[in-house]
């Protein structure tokens, strides 16, 4: 199991009575007296560990292979490596990242059905054998570049109920699957299993049932062709926050019976999945600062207000946008909600408002319309559930830098991490509720002790 130490990244252990929100407020207070009120994240690594415990309870037969593309921050990958997850990598760079943290090759699946030949060769030279394919061309590339590969056939699914659809780009049909299996046999390439992905943000858990059923058909085809498959990869699409229509346990309550029906526990089939946002979405909170403000009246050009009155509306410009962390709005169909760092007065008036990013592109709009009390330059806004498909795809367009990330973890979670490293997961460990986890802010296990003010540490990613 990979190590989890201070040397890898800076993480502060929270003292009893402190929460990640306290660290966020503290950091805001620290920078508020300076001119450099840059956007930043606070990320709770303990939240990721709690998600893992929840996974073990809800999907006991399924081994998670974290989708690195979702958030490739070193601290995230290191945390997941330390608790024993596998990793879904899509490129040479992602493979280098996880193997650089000591993750063995057998805990990596190269889950990209369309790979560059040089990167297939890199995987071969570094012991990564499991990889996906969905076409004859890919089979031929692998046969030449990595003949000892253990291939996983990616099949298409009905992802019409997903927010982000993937089967339009990846996946073989059932008819094509037989042809590909026959061709793999001719090329003497080993096909060990089937993978699918129902799409990100799936709103119908029954989609998983059909996909598992289709996978069973392909397993049976493989037996007829002469393969002995033993791996099923059920992909991703699991929610990572509680603000979704479909909850995680609602999905798993449908998946588990389907797995038991088509791939019973005595079938000898290993089952894995590729969760990404599930692990990281809720761990990250982003703080942005208002850098400019504009008052707009209904009759003024550029106002979208349909209100008959001449009441003013406000445009707020903040120091992160769709070319940075909020790229999730464009590419991940995210709907974000601004929270106020300062609690408004009970009788405070609210105005129709819009929120814009810092770049010179008119497309850089974060929130088209929301109701906010009047705010001012220098005030802060918070955005929760910002861990998935945000930092990984952020650019520096117009010269705006990516936000720094400040990592924290509660003392109980830290102690559990050390126990896992030393002795593995304790028997019958159960997910602990947030309310039973006192958050602490001091260092232990050789880490420097900080004063009760609970200063946070910075890591650049």
From Swiss-Prot:
Its lineage reads: Eukaryota, Metazoa, Chordata, Craniata, Vertebrata
Catalytic activity, per the record? L-ornithine + H(+) = putrescine + CO2
Q: Which GO terms describe its molecular function?
A: ornithine decarboxylase activity; protein homodimerization activity
Which keywords appear in this protein's UniProt record, sorted alphabetically? Decarboxylase, Lyase, Phosphoprotein, Polyamine biosynthesis, Pyridoxal phosphate, S-nitrosylation
* Binding partners and assembly: Homodimer. Only the dimer is catalytically active, as the active sites are constructed of residues from both monomers. Does not form a heterodimer with AZIN2.
Protein name stated in the entry: Ornithine decarboxylase
RNA-binding as UniProt keyword: no
Recorded name of the encoding gene: Odc1
Q: Which residues carry this modification: N6-(pyridoxal phosphate)lysine?
A: 69
**Expression tissues:** Expressed during testis development in the outer part of the seminiferous tubules.
Q: Does the keyword RNA-binding apply?
A: no
Q: Which organism is it from?
A: Mus musculus
Pathway per its UniProt entry is:
Amine and polyamine biosynthesis; putrescine biosynthesis via L-ornithine pathway; putrescine from L-ornithine: step 1/1
């Amino acid at each position: 199991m990979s190590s989890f130490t201070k040397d890898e990244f800076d993480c502060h252990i929270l003292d009893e009575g402190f929460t990640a929100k306290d660290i966020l407020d503290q950091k805001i207070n620290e920078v508020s007296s300076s001119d450099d009120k840059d956007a930043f994240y606070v990320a709770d690594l303990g939240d990721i560990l709690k998600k893992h415990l929840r996974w073990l309870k809800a999907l006991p037969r399924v081994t998670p292979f974290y989708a690195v593309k979702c958030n490739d921050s070193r601290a995230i990958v290191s945390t997941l490596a330390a608790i024993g997850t596998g990793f879904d990598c899509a490129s040479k760079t992602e493979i280098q990242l996880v193997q650089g943290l000591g993750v063995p090759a057998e805990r990596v699946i190269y889950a990209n059905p369309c790979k560059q030949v040089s990167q297939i060769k890199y995987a071969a030279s570094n012991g990564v054998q499991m990889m996906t394919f969905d076409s004859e061309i890919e089979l031929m590339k692998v046969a030449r570049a990595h003949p000892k590969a253990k291939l996983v056939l990616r099949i298409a699914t009905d992802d019409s109920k997903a927010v982000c659809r993937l089967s339009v780009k990846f996946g073989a049909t059932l008819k094509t699957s037989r042809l590909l299996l026959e061709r793999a046999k001719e090329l003497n390439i080993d096909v060990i299993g089937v993978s699918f992905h129902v799409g990100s943000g799936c709103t119908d858990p029954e989609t998983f049932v059909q996909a598992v059923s289709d996978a069973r058909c392909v397993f049976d085809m493989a037996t007829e062709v002469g393969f002995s498959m033993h791996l099923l990869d059920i992909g991703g699409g699991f929610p990572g926050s509680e603000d979704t229509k479909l909850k995680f346990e609602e999905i798993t309550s449908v998946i588990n019976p389907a797995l038991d029906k088509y791939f019973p526990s005595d079938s000898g089939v290993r089952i894995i999945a590729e969760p990404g946002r599930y692990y990281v979405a809720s761990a990250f909170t982003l703080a942005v600062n208002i850098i400019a403000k504009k008052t707009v009246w209904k009759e003024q050009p550029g106002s979208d207000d349909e209100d008959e009155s001449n009441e003013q509306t406000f445009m707020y410009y903040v120091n992160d946008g769709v070319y940075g962390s909020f790229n999730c709005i464009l590419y991940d169909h995210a709907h974000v909600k601004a929270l106020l760092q300062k609690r408004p007065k009970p009788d405070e008036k609210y105005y129709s408002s819009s929120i814009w990013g810092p770049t010179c592109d008119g497309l850089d709009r974060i929130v088209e319309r929301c109701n906010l009390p009047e705010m001012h330059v220098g005030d802060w806004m918070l955005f929760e559930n910002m861990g998935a498909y945000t930092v990984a795809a952020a650019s520096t367009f117009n010269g705006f830098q990516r936000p720094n990330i400040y990592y924290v973890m509660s003392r109980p979670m830290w102690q559990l991490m050390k126990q896992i490293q030393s002795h593995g997961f304790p028997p019958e460990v159960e997910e602990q509720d947030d309310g039973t986890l006192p958050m602490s802010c001091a260092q232990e296990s050789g880490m420097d002790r900080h004063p009760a003010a609970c200063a946070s540490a910075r890591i650049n990613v």
